[in-house]
Regions:
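Accessory regions of macromolecular translocation/handling assemblies
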Residues: 1-173
């Protein structure tokens, strides 16, 4: 999947499918990009077991650390989010075009408001990709134009290619 064309991706499905979909995207990007090319952040709910499982996978990779290596961009509650947001915002606003950011918003309540809106808006030279989740497609904000639908009765990937929506039926195991 090309995140340059599909930089706002919503993963829709039941908890098991959300877990698998998020980790699939995460590992694909980790294996294809060095930490110098792509950094990652994750905002999750530490009270939800599957999201803690995602956290335990993410915490080991160097892509999660700030450029200085002092901050791990993982937040499972409001206090942790408040601690990492200044460093993350600073790195996002730096004009280092060679570094992209992939942000997993498993719990968008941790960064509501202006920061969330700025993350969800796409820019021309967008180096910020966002992955969000929802149990149902209607629950996704409109900014998530591309969707990975992972439900019992409907399994498809909806992507945009040059402003044209392409729907690809897929079989998730």
């Amino acid at each position: 999947m090309d995140f340059r064309e599909n930089s706002r991706l919503g993963v829709v499905g039941e908890e098991k499918h959300l877990h698998d979909g998020v980790l699939q995207i995460f590992w694909q990007q980790v294996l294809h990009h060095s930490p110098e090319e792509m950094r990652m952040a994750c905002f999750f709910d530490s009270s939800i077991p599957w999201q803690m499982s995602v956290y335990h996978s993410m915490k080991w990779v160097p892509h999660i650390w700030s450029e200085s290596g002092e901050v791990r961009f993982l937040a499972g509650d409001k206090e942790a989010a408040a601690e990492i947001l200044p460093d993350l915002t600073r790195e996002l606003s730096a004009q280092k075009e060679q570094v992209s950011f992939l942000i997993f918003l498993l719990d968008p309540m941790l960064i509501l408001g202006e920061v969330l809106q700025s993350l969800l808006q796409e820019g021309k030279a967008d180096r910020v990709m966002v992955v969000g989740i929802a149990g149902k497609e209607q629950e996704l904000p409109k900014e998530y134009r591309s969707r990975m639908i992972w439900q019992k009765d409907r399994q498809e990937l909806q992507l945009y290619e040059k402003d044209k929506r392409i729907t690809v039926p897929v079989q998730y195991d």
